[in-house]
């Protein structure tokens, strides 16, 4: 009985450590064995058009900063499409967005349909060849969109993941823990990219060729499905 409990404990420990220790270690071994996956960053082509999409529910505390951020990006790239889906917010999110209605494609849902539904709808509404999906509380760097062009200049690239930087990691232990976890997650994603085996995108910011995207089932996370 003691032996069985010990074996079960070891198995549980291995399962816990696998995502953080053995899985990254296996990726490093694969990378050493066959080298990095081919990554072509061709000369930047500005022929690709870009749309930025995000869903919002009760985001009144950040929505104005988000819009200032995106309109700044449009100032740098005048043809940037901006699409927003409001998922029946019960705060002032929709009211704060309405003044921007003539500058963006805005859909305000009268009922809760969920983020996946909203992202699917915005992807259908978008006209650009590259669609960037992001979150309402994520601010995009001024160079975020221009950095996409060298990757998508390679026709074999269908999706590009963003790099998330926590700006409030010093505010609390929870924020610091989240930032530490995300740094580990990003390290793993880099190893997956190096070995040509990225499992999922980052929901905070990722870009995909619109013609390659397929509707995401309602019960599946969009960044995992992609």
What is the role of each PLM region?
Residues 1-44, 193:
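N-terminal membrane-anchoring/stem segments of glycan-assembly enzymes
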Residues 48-51, 81, 225:
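Cell-envelope/extracellular polymer assembly enzymes that use nucleotide-activated donors
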Residues 51, 69, 85-94, 111-113, ...:
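A conserved acidic beta->alpha catalytic loop
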Residues 62-65, 90-99, 143:
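Acidic helix N-cap motif at the loop->helix transition within catalytic regions
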Residues 68-79:
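Short, acidic, metal-binding catalytic loop of nucleotide-sugar glycosyltransferases
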Residues 80-83, 94-125, 176-178, 182, ...:
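Conserved donor nucleotide-binding strand/loop of the catalytic core
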Residues 131:
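Short aromatic/hydrophobic "clamp" motif used to bind/position activated sugar donors
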Residues 142-176:
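Conserved donor NDP-sugar-binding/catalytic core segment of glycosyltransferases
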């Amino acid at each position: 009985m003691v032996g069985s409990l010990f074996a079960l404990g070891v198995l549980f420990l291995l399962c816990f450590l696998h995502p953080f220790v053995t899985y990254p270690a296996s990726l490093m071994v694969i990378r050493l064995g066959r080298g990095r996956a081919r990554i072509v960053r061709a000369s930047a082509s500005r022929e690709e058009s870009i749309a930025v999409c995000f869903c919002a529910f009760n985001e009144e505390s950040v929505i104005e900063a988000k819009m200032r951020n995106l309109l700044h990006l449009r100032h740098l790239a005048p043809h940037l499409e901006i699409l927003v889906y409001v998922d029946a917010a019960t705060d002032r999110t929709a009211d704060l967005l309405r003044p921007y209605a003539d500058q963006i494609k805005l859909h305000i849902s009268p009922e809760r349909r969920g983020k996946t539904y909203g992202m699917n709808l915005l992807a259908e509404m978008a006209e650009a060849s590259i669609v960037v999906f992001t979150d309402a509380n994520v601010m995009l760097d001024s160079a975020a969109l221009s950095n996409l062009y060298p990757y998508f200049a390679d026709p074999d690239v269908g999706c590009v993941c963003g790099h998330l930087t926590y700006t409030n990691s010093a505010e609390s232990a929870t924020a610091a823990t989240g930032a530490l976890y995300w740094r580990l997650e990003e390290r793993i994603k880099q190893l997956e990219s190096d070995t040509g085996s990225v499992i999922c995108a980052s929901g905070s910011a990722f870009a995909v060729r619109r013609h390659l995207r397929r509707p995401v089932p309602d019960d599946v996370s969009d960044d995992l499905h992609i």
